Curated annotation (Swiss-Prot):
Belongs to the DMRL synthase family. Transmembrane segments: none annotated. InterPro entries: LS, LS/RS, LS/RS_sf. This is 6,7-dimethyl-8-ribityllumazine synthase. Pathway: Cofactor biosynthesis; riboflavin biosynthesis; riboflavin from 2-hydroxy-3-oxobutyl phosphate and 5-amino-6-(D-ribitylamino)uracil: step 1/2. The active site is at H93. It comes from Pseudarthrobacter chlorophenolicus (strain ATCC 700700 / DSM 12829 / CIP 107037 / JCM 12360 / KCTC 9906 / NCIMB 13794 / A6). Coiled coil: none annotated.
């Protein structure tokens, strides 16, 4: 499983005075509702763990639209998290959407200096998405992980602003 070797970042060990003041936006795609609901629940749980009770949450149609939404939000927030699911089909569409979302979100983060948590699942099967969505019985919680990474990075970057 891809989570092997992942860092153990506990948001509760970060300074709550720092994390609770962070402005967090979560941009969530709409395809694959069950998986997306799990990702979003995990992301909101991580925000709450960090003392952020009401992050801004917006929905976009799909993963292809995540970068433009993140770009619009980034200047107004300390961290942005992008959540989406792309499942391989029988055409090259999978590669195009995955590449566009990945490079677009990376570009937003580097260009704005705002961490963008990458919670876009790129799966060969729906089961792989379910296994990573933080649902009961899931092996991983990528929504939680994406928020944790973005907020931990935002705390580090605040030290250098």
């Amino acid at each position: 499983m891809s989570g092997h070797g992942a860092p153990d970042i506990d948001l509760t060990t970060l300074n709550p005075a720092e994390t609770s003041q962070l402005r967090l936006a979560i941009v969530a795609a709409s395809w694959h509702t069950q998986i997306m609901d799990g990702l979003l629940d995990g992301a909101l749980r991580a925000a709450k763990d960090a003392g952020i009770n009401e992050p801004t949450v917006i929905r976009v149609p799909g993963s292809f639209e995540l970068p433009v939404a993140a770009a619009r939000l980034a200047p107004h927030f300390d961290a942005v998290v992008a959540l989406g699911v792309v499942i391989r089909g029988g055409t090259p569409h999978f590669e195009y959407v995955c590449q566009a979302a990945t490079s677009g979100l990376t570009d937003v983060s580097v260009r704005t200096g705002v961490p963008v948590g990458f919670g876009v699942l790129t799966c060969d099967t729906e089961q792989q998405g379910l296994d990573r969505a933080g649902l009961p019985g899931s092996k991983e919680d990528k929504g939680h992980e994406a928020v944790t990474a973005a907020l931990a990075t935002a705390v580090v970057l605040k030290q250098y602003s």
